[in-house]
Design a protein with these regions (language model features):
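RNase H-like nuclease fold core
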Residues: 1-62, 67, 71, 76-79, ...
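Conserved, well-ordered core segments of regulatory domains
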Residues: 1-7, 64, 83-86, 144, ...
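Hydrophobic/aromatic-lined pockets within catalytic cores
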Residues: 51, 55, 74-78, 94, ...
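A short, charged helix-loop
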Residues: 35, 104-108, 112, 116, ...
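Flexible, active-site-adjacent loop/turn segments at secondary-structure boundaries
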Residues: 3, 19, 28-30, 53, ...
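Acidic/histidine-rich catalytic cores and adjacent linkers
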Residues: 115-232
């Protein structure tokens, strides 16, 4: 979220950014655009733009609980699964937990995602819900019960990928770098100025080792698809 001047007032402006891992396993920056706010209309326009530029074969979309993005993704990339970032989800649960209980609850939540497979994770989630209710953390228990499934999509992918596809930490690091570079400006004269500076920073990142180092072994995906075809 950046600030820009509009009719003499300083207002917030959102920049929507998308990165991806390509078919060879390397990270790419797909695009950036200005959005008045992170709603479905803004994300739909952005995803439509990316799809129009040739984005296809999307298998998994990772984000925080941005319903505008989740809904738009289902419309433009219906074949893709949605993975809710477990880090953001943990923080959401912690917001309903007393500070004295956060460490205990954190261990409970991490135990869910330490499961060896989807079945084990679901079974652990049931136990966590019971424990939270036993601690009278009703709201936290309800959040786990209603939303934990959104954090388990990564189990459908190779185990070697799990740690890197269940959070949107790679994007968060990029956004922090953009905020660091733009903070010195304060309020931009217009949205385009903010967009230009952010895009320049993204181009710089794309030219570093960030995009030259293989992030995922995508051969594992091909092996998984082949095994599935044989089983079917």
């Amino acid at each position: 979220m950046l600030k820009r001047c509009w009719a003499g007032e300083v207002r917030n402006v959102s920049l929507l950014v998308a990165i991806a891992v390509n078919g060879e396993g390397y990270r790419e920056i797909l695009g950036i655009c200005e959005g008045a706010k992170e709603d479905k209309a803004g994300w739909s326009a952005f995803l439509k733009h990316l799809k129009g530029r040739g984005l296809h074969g999307v298998r998994l979309i990772v984000s925080d609980a941005c319903m505008g993005l989740a809904e738009s993704a289902a419309e433009f990339f219906p074949e893709a699964a949605w993975q809710r970032c477990i880090v953001h989800w943990y923080r959401n649960v912690f917001s309903h937990v007393p500070s004295t209980k956060v460490r205990e609850v954190a261990a409970m939540l991490k135990a869910i995602h330490a499961g060896e497979d989807l079945v084990a994770a679901r079974q652990q989630a049931v136990r966590v819900i019971e424990k939270l209710r036993g601690l009278r953390l009703t709201t936290a228990a309800e959040l786990v019960e209603t939303a934990v499934e959104e954090t388990l999509a990564y189990y459908a992918f190779p185990e070697e990928h799990w740690r890197r596809i269940r959070t949107n930490n790679p994007l968060e690091r990029i956004l922090r770098e953009i905020r660091r570079r733009t903070r010195v400006v304060g309020a931009f004269p217009d949205g385009q100025s903010a967009l230009n500076l952010a895009a320049a920073r993204l181009r710089h990142i794309a030219g570093t080792a960030w995009s030259n180092k293989r992030y995922l072994n995508t051969e594992l995906l091909k092996d998984q698809q082949m095994r599935g075809a044989i089983t079917a």
